[in-house]
């Protein structure tokens, strides 16, 4: 048992990402909460300027710097997996997309035994989290912490791409987070007053004035402390290098995400006994599902050169972009206060007759963009394109320990294209994107097809050689009603009292879209469970 003079709290939350920030706000309304985050505070101006997300991704700023093991289905390449290592977690470095997924995703969860996670049950928590620019209706929330709106990026090529989608026979949806997901649509983003609205901005900062909420940055958690079958606290290395033990009177909650949470469970002796034994770790709780069931969205790009320079290229000239960045950071206005692209789409290949299985992410600028100033800094080629993402892969990977050293990175195997159906689906999606790019409305902008994909073999080779993730790893502490799951329907770790996992790792399978909104929803719903409060009434929308 912990000594009487220990650091004692009601709850200890490991990780201040999308879920951790949400939990910190809700639980500290009436309890003593310690949040441990290995990264630093989100004071870097680049975090808060929407346009700068590309720079942060390219330079892997505030990032765990994870990469996979060599991927057999991707020509043996190691694929980068950016994960936020900063207050706000990945919500502080992502592209700010606000996507809930398809209602069928949650009804599928309910059909597997997670009856309290149907669309009717989760919609009220999506509504509670957001402050939508259009106000409250049966689908949207108008007074929540997380600001959401349509992108305002304007360039004739954006409207042309949407028109090309219509010419190719695809419909339009005014709100893919509302009644209908399928179709082309304006992107929705988490931006407030021209600046990134991360989970830290939305949830954590408003709660910092509470004396019962303590945030410690630079804290690397080594293991969960167990007293018999009960979690009683954590051991961590502080920013100063000291080994510290903190104790939780009520619960320890892991919110480190789909890579770090299963790793911490295994380091604590909770996992597959054979794997733990291979690293010299004593098995405290045998739980074979820990680290299994890893999923992520695979994507590949269809690219074009642009005939005449567009707005993105013009604004990247050094003198202009410096002014734009200053305006965005200081006043939340101007070109850099939004993300270029404007259009997304959720489409059916026909391989899954019920749900859209492909997402388009249109980009109105070059992936290699850098500030330029002739004749001193040469310009980059002006390009645009469409990233095609496979929404519901059948392939499953895993997270395993690289070492018993808590500082050593976990081993990540995505197993992309491990199932043939995944290759068929993304191949079909790539063909759809190529077809849209050949429609008349977009033709005036197209200089040349950079990818020039015609045959199945060319598409397959392109995907294997260039495909990347969309940075949505989930599933490694799978929630379920069956004994093989890692957590039960209330996110409680099986076989351990007072220990929960609340983050993307508990998702049983991937939803049809970006996952930040989903992780916040899970944390909102879990907060009610943890506090013993009645769940919000199911929606009939």
Predicted regions and their residues:
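A conserved FAD-binding loop/helix module that cradles the flavin
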Residues: 510-530
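N-terminal glycine-rich phosphate/pyrophosphate-binding loop and immediately adjacent elements
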Residues: 2-127, 286-287, 297-306
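Residue-level detector of alpha-helix initiation sites
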Residues: 13, 17-18, 152, 258-259, ...
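Internal hydrophobic alpha-helix adjacent to the cofactor/substrate pocket in enzyme cavities
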Residues: 165, 281-282, 431-438, 524-536
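FAD cofactor-binding and catalytic pocket of flavoenzymes
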Residues: 303-423, 469-473, 501-504, 508
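A glycine-rich dinucleotide-binding beta-alpha-beta segment and adjacent secondary-structure elements
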Residues: 51-52, 67, 184-187, 191-192, ...
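Glycine-rich loop(s) and the adjacent beta-strand/alpha-helix scaffold that form part
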Residues: 32-33, 39-42, 224, 233-324, ...
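Conserved redox-cofactor binding core of oxidoreductases
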Residues: 110-231, 235-237, 301-322
């Amino acid at each position: 048992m912990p000594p009487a003079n220990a650091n004692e709290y009601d709850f200890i939350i490991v990780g201040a990402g999308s879920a951790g920030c949400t939990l910190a706000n809700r639980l500290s309304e009436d309890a003593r909460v310690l949040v441990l985050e290995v990264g630093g505070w989100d004071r870097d101006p680049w975090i808060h300027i929407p346009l700068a997300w590309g720079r942060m991704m390219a330079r892997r700023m505030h990032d765990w710097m994870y990469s996979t093991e060599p991927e057999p289905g991707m020509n043996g390449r190691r694929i980068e997996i950016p994960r936020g290592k900063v207050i706000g977690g990945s919500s502080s470095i992502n592209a700010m997309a606000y996507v809930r997924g398809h209602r069928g995703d949650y009804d599928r969860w309910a059909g597997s035994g997670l009856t309290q996670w149907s669309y009717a049950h989760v919609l009220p928590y999506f509504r509670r989290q957001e402050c939508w620019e259009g106000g409250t209706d049966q689908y949207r929330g108008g007074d929540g912490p997380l600001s959401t709106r349509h992108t305002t990026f304007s360039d004739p090529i954006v409207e042309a791409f949407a028109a090309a989608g219509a010419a190719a026979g695809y419909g339009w949806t005014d709100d893919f987070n509302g009644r209908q997901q399928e179709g082309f649509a304006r992107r929705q983003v988490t931006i407030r007053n021209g600046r990134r609205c991360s989970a830290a901005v939305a949830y954590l900062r408003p709660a910092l004035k509470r004396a019962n909420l303590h945030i410690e940055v630079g804290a690397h958690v080594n293991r969960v402390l167990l007293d018999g079958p009960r979690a009683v606290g954590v051991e961590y290395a502080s920013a100063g290098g000291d080994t510290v033990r903190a104790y939780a009177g009520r619960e320890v909650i892991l919110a480190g995400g789909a890579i770090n949470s299963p790793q911490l469970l295994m380091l604590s002796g909770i996992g597959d006994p054979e794997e733990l034994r291979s690293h010299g770790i004593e098995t405290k709780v045998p739980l074979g599902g820990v680290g299994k069931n890893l999923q992520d969205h695979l994507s590949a790009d269809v690219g074009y050169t642009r005939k005449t320079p567009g707005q993105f290229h013009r604004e990247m000239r050094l003198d202009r972009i410096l002014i734009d960045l200053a305006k965005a950071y200081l006043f939340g206005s101007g070109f850099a206060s939004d993300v270029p692209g404007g259009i997304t789409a959720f489409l059916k290949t026909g391989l899954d007759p019920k749900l859209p299985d492909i997402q388009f992410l249109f980009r109105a600028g070059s992936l290699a963009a850098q500030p330029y100033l002739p004749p001193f800094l040469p310009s980059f080629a002006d390009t645009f394109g469409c990233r095609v993402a496979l929404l519901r892969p059948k392939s499953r990977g895993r997270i395993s320990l690289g070492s018993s050293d808590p500082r050593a990175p976990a081993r990540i195997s995505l197993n992309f294209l491990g199932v043939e159906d995944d290759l068929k689906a993304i191949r079909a999606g790539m063909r759809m994107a190529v077809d849209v790019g050949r429609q008349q409305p977009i033709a005036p902008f197209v200089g040349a097809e950079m990818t020039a994909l015609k045959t199945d073999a060319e598409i397959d080779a392109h995907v294997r050689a260039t495909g990347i993730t969309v940075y949505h790893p989930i599933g490694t502490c799978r929630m379920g009603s069956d004994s093989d799951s890692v957590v039960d329907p209330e996110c409680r770790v099986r076989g351990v009292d007072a220990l929960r996992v609340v983050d993307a790792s508990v998702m049983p399978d991937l939803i049809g879209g970006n996952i930040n909104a989903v992780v916040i929803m899970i944390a909102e719903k879990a907060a009610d469970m943890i506090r013993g409060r009645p769940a919000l009434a199911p929606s009939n929308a």
